[in-house]
Structures are given as structure tokens and as C-alpha cells.
């Protein structure tokens, strides 16, 4: 599966190119973009047969793109320049809509726009950029659009140019620059509804970023980009107090009096925040007090209660606790909580208990379960699932390696169901991005020596076998230096700290010291240990911000909770962060459900919901340097089947063909757009 599966704007973009590239040419009637400068000669009438042109357009609009492309090509062979090139570009758009990238690429290569008006070069580059996107070559796609449109290019085409650049930047994970590009697009839109949609896309893009990132990178007032960033922070920080939020919005407008944000946008967000913020007054907590999950439940509850007591007493919900040690009691406990007047349930923790609720049909009150299960048929809409999923980490490792420009992977995971889950998640995500998993090996976590799977993974054992075979044939000693396979870009592995500290040195010893290593958070014990972790030198891994970059001095920091719970087991410390987030998620679940692009900055990651109401965590990345994690920050969130904000904007009309005439054309009026640097670039 290729990256194009995740680019919903593609079809829309091609359709826009197709439906308007050649507007019907009426004899001796000028089209808007062809209006000549006053007093100059009229351009010639189009020689393109109107009936055939209408037929090609009709075929395209009814979805018969191949037939449309064939007719456009046929027309092109009979037309002089520049009508020939215009029709060729229309055919390219048709092939793209038909998913025939091979034909589109070939025909684009045959389309010579040398010497033609700048609009032709721009259209060709935009098509080439689209092909690069479909081939997962995002850097190439963006480089094709680095040159700004010429001044005489129509507003409509300039709009599409900025929208496509914003799309590429978003796919690369560069959300800040994607939002900036949408901001430039915004200044070109005159239709109030279309502009409102675009401004919503700007805020949807920026609210994915953490509050910390927005705060650090926000320029000073009164720049446009800084205004969007501050507005995104206000939206992200909403805590259920309409009066305070209204005051913040009023103060924002005073700080950014000339900002283009429409009043309808601010009012709409204000109303939406009020309706989507869940006020819970009676909260039921279902956690086991005994059994295998009791210690984990205690850690979760400690974090939960620490967050609970940060809320002013008047705003805290009433808590009701239920012992869910026996998973079979889950449904009766849920009914008991409902009958007692609970507004919402937190828990259960056991997967079988979560499964009971998933198969219950409808749930009268919402549930935030503290574990995740595979999707179920007829799963209740108000069942939310939150857990420290290792599958999330494996997928993010794949995304990080892909963003780092790598494509050929090896993997090593433990034997058993846990390792299989991690491997499957890594492989599926890696291959969906366009990467190749060359080989994987498993290891016995109870073993003392992990040399065999490492040797096999690197093909060192095959190299040794060839040496023995040569020595047998030659009947003499053969000078030999083992050589690992050379077709690999990096290694992914999952292991607990003690095992990771053995596997990493083995990879280095067997000639893989220069290979990047990506791992899950399980390689890190949770606190700096330079003496032991020096064996992990160079390894990259994702982990929760609470451990890697927790706010010092906070009442919810790692140190603060360690002081509160001195007897807590270190292996459960990530569950403390999850407990904090489980409480803080409650009022935001409806907002996150309504918009999968929006996030909550949590202690266990940057949190967002998928289409089945499972909470996912975007984690912080670190690299071991001198035995200590060096924080790299959050990796960009890679698209995964979501509709890109702004991709549903109203369609625009593509500019007409520019006749091949020496008469200069009047440039389209363009609103003043800030040049790079005018708005304090970041």
C-alpha cells in the first residue's frame, strides 16, 4: 500500500484541474483571464472544436477519465501551440484521476511548455508534484513548487498552488509551515464561506501542535501567523469556563486588531467549545483491588487522584469506586453505577472486561476504558479506550524512520504474542509508507546469549558458511573477515532494558555500528542511568513526555509523585502518567471525537482519538548520548487515513488557456500578500 491511500485531496485537486483547464471558448468572446490590456489587439479565437471539447469534459465529469484522456490527446494532436499543450495537460489530469500514473507521467514528459506563458509551466509543475506525492517523494514534490507563481497567473491557480504546498508540508509533518501556507492562501480567497473553511483548516492544523511548541515558536504581535498560533492556544486551553474564554478572545482581538480571522470563526469556535466540553459531576471508577492487575490499577489510581486534586474543590466530580477484580462482574457494576447516578465511568482495566462493554450494544453513559481491544461489530459509540499501546510505539518508530529518509529495514523482536503484535504493527505501518522490511528475527527473552538471531539477521552466518565452503573446496585456510548484509538502512527492535543493553552491543560488534537503531520505549528504564545505558549509545526511541521532559516543580511531575508515593514500583511509573491523563481526558473526549485532528497535550503523550474512539499517543523522541536520553522532541504526526483539513474546500475554477500571442495579458489583481520574512518567519 502506497502513501497515496492517505491523500484524499488528490482526487479533488485533479478534478479541479480537469473541469476548468479549458473553459468553453465562444467565438470572439473573451474569457476572464484573457482580457487584453486596454488598446491592444484581441487574442485569436480558439481553434479547438467546441463539441469535442464539451464531450471530453462530459466524460471526465461522469467519471470516464480514460476516455476523456484519450479524447483530450486526440484533440491535442490536431491543435497548434499553445492549445496542444493545454489539452495535453488536461489529459494528464484525467490520467491522474484514473489512477494511471504511468500514462500521466509519460504524457507529462511529452508536453513541452518552453516559451509559453508562465501559467503552463506552473500547471506542468503542479502535475509533476502530484506524481511525486503519489510516489511518496515528498521532498521532490515540494521542490517542484518552490518557485512562486508569476504575477500574471490567475488568483484561482495561485490558490491551488498554496493549497497543494500546504498539503505536501502537512504530509511531511511540517504543521507550522503548512498552516503558514494556508495563511497565504487565505489572503487570496474572497468568498466568505470558502475563507471561513480555510481559516478552520488553519486552526485545525495548528491545534495538532502541543501548547509548548506553539508558545516557544509564536512570533510577537501583531503578525498574522503569531495571531493564528495564539488563537490555537486559546482553543486548546479551554477548560469549561465560557466567561474566561470570551475574555481571552476579546484580549486576543485587541492584541491582533488587523488579523484576518473572521468574526464568524471566533464565534463558531466559542460556541463549539461550549457544546463539546463535557462537565461530569458524578464519576464512577472501576478498577481491580486484587489479582494480577491490582498493582497496575494502584499506579493508575494514584496518578488519577493526583490530577483530581489539582481541580478546585467546587469543580471536582463526586467519585464512586467499584472493585472490578472479577471481569465477569463488569456489566453489573456498570449498571450499578448508572443507577447510582454516575455521569461517566472510568475503567475497567481488564481486556475481557472492556470486551464485555464493547459487546453490550448501547451504553447509557460514556465509558473511558483503561485498555484497548480489537474493533468489535456494533461497538457502542460512547465507549472510549485508552491504553499505553506498544502498537502505537511500533507504528511511530516506522514513521520516524521514514521521515528520517530510510527505506530498508530489519527487525528483531521477542518471541510470543507481545513481540508478534509489535512486529505486525511496525511492518504494516512501514509497508504502508512505502518501506521494505527485508527480514526479521525473534529472540528468546529468557536466553542468556542473543548472538544467534543477530548473526542471522545480519547474514553473518551465511558469510561464515561461505567461508567454510571455500575452505573445504580449496583444502586450505582462507583469509576471511565477516561481512554483514549491505542492503539495509536501519534496525528496529523491541526489548526490555536488560536485553536491549546486550542486543545493541552485539549489532555494533557484528559490523552494524553505523546502522541507525530505532526501538520502542521499553528499552528505557524510565530514569537516566549513564553507566548502564552507555551500551545503548545512538539508539532512538519514543517515550512519554512525563519521563523525558516533565515540567520541573509541577505538582504532577515525576519527582512530586515519587514523593507522594515513595513505595511505588518503578516498573509502573508510566501508568502514573496515564492515570493523570485519564482524568484530564474526560472533559475533552467529545471535542476529540468530533475532530480527529485536534489533540490534548497529555503527560503520556499528545493525545488524539481515531474513528473507533481509541486514544492514541504521539510520543516524544529521544536519542541516547553518553548514556543519557537527549530529547529530540515530538516527531511530526504522519497522516493515516484522515481527511486533511482544508481538503473539502469549495471547488475553484481553473484559469483558461492563454493564447499563443505576443500581446501581453493584463495580470489578475492580487491582494497584498506578505513576502517571506514580513511576518517574523519561524
Positions of PLM-derived features:
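Beta-alpha junction/loop-to-helix N-cap segments that form part of ligand/metal-binding clefts
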Residues: 119, 295-300, 310, 314-375
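Bacterial signal peptide processing site
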Residues: 22-25
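Solvent-exposed, acidic/polar segments of extracytosolic/periplasmic ligand-binding ectodomains
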Residues: 530-531, 603-682
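Segments of small-molecule ligand-sensing domains
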Residues: 560-631
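Extracytoplasmic ligand/sensor domains, especially the bilobed periplasmic-binding protein
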Residues: 344-347, 351-441
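Extracellular/periplasmic periplasmic-binding protein-like sensory domains
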Residues: 460-467, 486-488, 504-580
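Extended repeat-based interaction scaffolds and adjacent low-complexity, acidic/S/T/P-biased segments
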Residues: 154, 160, 176-274, 279, ...
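Solenoid-like repeat scaffolds
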Residues: 37-46, 73-83, 109-120, 146-155, ...
Amino acid at each position: 500500500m502506497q502513501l497515496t491511500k492517505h491523500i484524499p485531496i488528490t482526487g479533488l485537486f485533479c478534478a479541479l484541474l480537469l473541469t476548468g483547464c479549458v473553459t468553453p471558448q465562444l467565438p470572439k468572446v473573451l474569457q476572464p483571464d484573457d482580457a487584453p490590456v486596454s488598446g491592444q489587439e484581441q487574442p485569436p479565437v480558439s481553434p479547438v472544436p467546441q463539441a469535442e471539447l464539451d464531450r471530453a469534459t462530459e466524460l471526465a465529469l461522469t467519471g470516464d477519465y480514460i476516455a476523456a484522456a484519450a479524447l483530450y490527446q486526440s484533440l491535442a494532436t490536431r491543435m497548434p501551440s499553445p492549445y496542444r499543450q493545454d489539452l495535453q495537460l488536461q489529459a494528464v489530469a484525467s490520467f491522474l484521476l484514473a489512477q494511471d500514473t504511468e500514462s500521466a507521467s509519460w504524457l507529462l514528459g511529452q508536453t513541452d511548455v518552453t516559451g509559453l506563458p508562465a501559467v503552463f509551466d506552473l500547471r506542468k509543475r503542479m502535475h509533476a508534484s502530484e506524481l511525486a506525492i503519489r510516489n511518496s517523494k515528498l521532498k521532490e514534490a515540494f521542490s517542484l513548487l518552490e518557485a512562486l507563481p508569476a504575477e500574471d497567473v490567475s488568483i484561482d491557480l495561485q490558490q491551488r498552488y498554496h493549497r497543494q504546498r500546504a498539503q505536501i508540508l502537512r504530509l511531511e509533518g511540517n504543521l507550522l509551515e503548512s498552516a503558514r501556507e494556508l495563511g497565504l492562501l487565505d489572503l487570496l480567497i474572497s468568498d466568505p464561506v470558502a475563507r471561513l473553511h480555510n481559516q478552520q483548516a488553519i486552526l485545525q492544523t495548528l491545534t495538532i501542535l502541543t501548547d509548548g511548541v506553539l508558545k516557544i515558536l509564536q512570533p510577537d504581535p501583531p503578525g498574522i501567523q503569531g495571531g493564528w498560533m495564539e488563537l490555537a492556544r486559546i482553543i486548546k486551553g479551554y477548560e469549561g469556563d465560557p466567561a474566561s474564554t470570551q475574555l481571552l478572545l476579546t484580549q486576543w482581538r485587541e492584541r491582533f486588531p488587523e488579523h484576518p480571522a473572521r468574526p464568524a470563526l471566533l464565534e463558531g469556535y466559542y460556541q463549539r467549545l461550549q457544546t463539546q466540553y463535557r462537565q461530569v459531576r458524578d464519576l464512577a471508577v472501576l478498577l481491580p483491588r486484587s489479582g494480577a492487575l491490582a498493582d497496575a490499577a494502584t499506579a493508575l489510581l494514584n496518578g488519577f487522584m493526583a490530577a483530581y486534586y489539582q481541580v478546585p474543590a467546587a469543580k471536582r466530580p463526586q467519585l464512586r469506586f467499584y472493585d472490578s477484580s472479577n471481569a465477569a462482574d463488569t456489566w453489573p457494576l456498570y449498571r450499578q453505577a448508572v443507577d447510582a447516578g454516575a455521569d461517566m465511568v472510568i475503567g475497567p482495566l481488564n481486556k475481557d472486561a472492556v470486551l464485555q462493554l464493547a459487546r453490550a450494544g448501547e451504553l447509557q453513559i460514556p465509558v473511558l476504558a483503561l485498555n484497548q481491544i480489537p474493533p468489535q461489530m456494533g461497538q457502542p459509540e460512547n465507549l472510549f479506550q485508552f491504553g499505553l499501546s506498544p502498537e502505537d510505539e511500533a507504528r511511530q518508530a516506522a514513521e520516524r524512520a521514514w521521515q528520517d529518509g530510510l527505506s530498508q529495514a530489519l527487525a528483531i523482536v521477542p518471541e510470543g504474542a507481545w513481540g508478534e503484535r509489535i512486529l505486525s504493527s511496525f511492518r504494516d505501518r512501514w509497508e504502508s509508507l512505502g518501506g521494505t522490511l527485508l527480514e526479521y528475527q525473534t529472540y528468546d527473552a529468557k536466553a542468556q546469549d542473543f548472538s544467534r538471531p543477530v548473526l542471522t539477521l545480519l547474514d553473518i552466518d551465511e558469510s561464515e558458511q561461505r567461508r567454510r565452503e571455500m575452505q573445504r573446496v580449496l583444502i586450505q585456510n582462507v583469509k576471511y573477515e565477516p561481512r554483514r548484509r549491505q542492503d539495509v538502512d536501519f534496525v528496529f527492535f523491541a526489548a526490555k532494558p536488560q536485553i536491549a543493553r546486550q542486543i545493541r552491543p552485539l549489532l555494533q560488534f557484528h559490523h552494524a555500528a553505523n546502522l541507525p537503531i530505532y526501538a520502542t520505549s521499553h528499552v528505557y528504564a524510565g530514569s537516566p542511568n549513564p553507566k548502564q545505558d552507555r551500551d545503548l549509545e545512538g539508539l532512538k526511541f519514543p517515550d512519554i513526555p512525563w519521563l523525558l521532559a516533565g515540567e520541573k516543580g509541577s505538582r504532577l511531575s515525576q519527582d512530586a509523585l515519587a514523593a507522594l508515593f515513595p513505595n511505588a514500583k518503578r516498573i509502573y511509573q508510566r501508568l502514573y502518567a496515564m492515570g493523570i491523563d485519564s482524568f484530564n481526558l474526560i472533559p475533552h473526549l467529545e471535542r476529540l471525537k468530533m475532530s480527529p485532528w485536534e489533540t490534548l497535550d497529555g503527560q503520556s503523550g499528545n493525545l488524539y482519538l481515531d474513528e473507533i474512539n481509541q486514544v492514541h499517543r504521539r510520543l516524544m523522541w529521544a536519542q541516547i548520548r553518553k548514556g543519557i536520553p537527549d530529547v529530540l522532541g515530538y516527531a511530526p504526526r504522519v497522516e493515516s487515513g484522515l481527511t486533511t483539513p482544508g481538503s473539502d474546500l469549495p471547488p475553484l475554477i481553473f484559469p483558461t488557456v492563454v493564447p499563443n500571442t505576443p500581446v501581453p495579458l493584463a495580470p489578475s489583481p492580487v491582494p497584498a500578500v506578505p513576502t517571506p520574512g514580513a511576518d517574523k518567519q519561524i
